[in-house]
Amino acid sequence: MHEFEIIKKYFSKLSLNNKNSLNLNDDVFFDKSKKLVVSVDTYINKSHFFDFKDPDLVIKKILRSSISDLICKGVKPKYYFISGSGNKKTFTKFNLSKISQSLKKEQKKFGIHISGGDTVFSNKLSFTIISVGFSSNIIFRNKAKLNDDIYVTGNLGDSYLSLIHI
């Protein structure tokens, strides 16, 4: 079963027709009255990145991928929360320092600020990022129509190439 099938079958009814949840199929939560836009993404080692030898590259990939959910909606990200699970081999002082340095560079580049998170010791390496922005309007995925223009930044396929490189 694919992601959208799982969401539709098991979770969409839980949103209780909350219009802000966008039927759980548009990558973000959007509360128009509060101008609040929120996105959450989880990244698992061996699925979303294959090597943690260069934590800087992994952090760049996952943070940029997460905030892109807001950016593609026309929303400027403002805050993010990051949670990580790992063990003594992945959460070494060296790696934690690299993660911190990379987050600092990305914050400066995109004008975003860390606002919280969590760390858990586990044999599985993973990260979850919640991105938060504010806007009175967003671009809805499900409102795309035939003959709409599509704009792409960078090269198509770069995401896949970076995945096999990491």
Please provide the spans of the model-predicted regions:
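Glycine-rich anion-binding loops of enzyme active sites
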Residues: Y43, K76-S162
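Conserved small/polar residues in nucleotide/adenosyl-binding loops
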Residues: I164-I166
